Amino acid sequence: YYDFLSLKTNVSESRKEKARWALVIGDVMGKGIPAGLLMTMLRGMLRAEVLTGLPPDRILHDLNQLAINDLDQSHRFVTLFYSDFDPRTKKLRYSNAAHNPPLLWKNAEQKIIKLDTEGFVLGLQKDAQYNCCEIKLQDNDLILYYTDGVIDSSNALGERFDEDKLIKVLSKLCKQSYSSQEILNKIFKKLDDFTGQNRHLEDDASIVVFQLR
């Protein structure tokens, strides 16, 4: 699951004003219709919660409070990474509920850092607390959001396309100044080549690429 949400809550605001955006990626434990229904429910809760304008850590805290009974009854949990970006200040705030940390390519420094912060999965602990971090982005910085289906994919020898492999592939592509769409396509091509064209991914593999221009 991934989503993009406009955080402009005042309908009278000028259309020319740049609104903040929320970028979210998450994964529910399990597969099939029950997991899909839970994620749909959570998506609705999240879309209502973001309109409060609260910081990411409070968003995750409140979302956990809202969803914990349904998740507990289904014996499932959810990992979720929530971030919001302000194009006026170029600042990204983020909070993590035990999801795979997105990879940030810092173009000026030619290196990748992980956007990680402590936080418990949604649905297991009612009083779970979350941290909020903030980072300022620069032009041509790029963030790769992904689900664990990417790095848990394996080839015929049982080798995993792990986080280290993903970082190496992303770093090489970013250094060649590809567009965000080209990077997305080439990563999936690398994944197909690694697992074999006829092999099915063991879990859903979702990737979102956000590039600042």
Predicted segments — roles?
Residues Y1, I59-L66, I183, I187:
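Amphipathic alpha-helical coiled-coil segments that mediate homodimerization
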Residues I33-G53, I113, L137-N198, E202:
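Active-site-proximal, acidic helix/loop segment immediately C-terminal to a metal-coordinating Asp/Glu
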Residues R20, V24:
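Flexible loop/N-cap segments at domain edges
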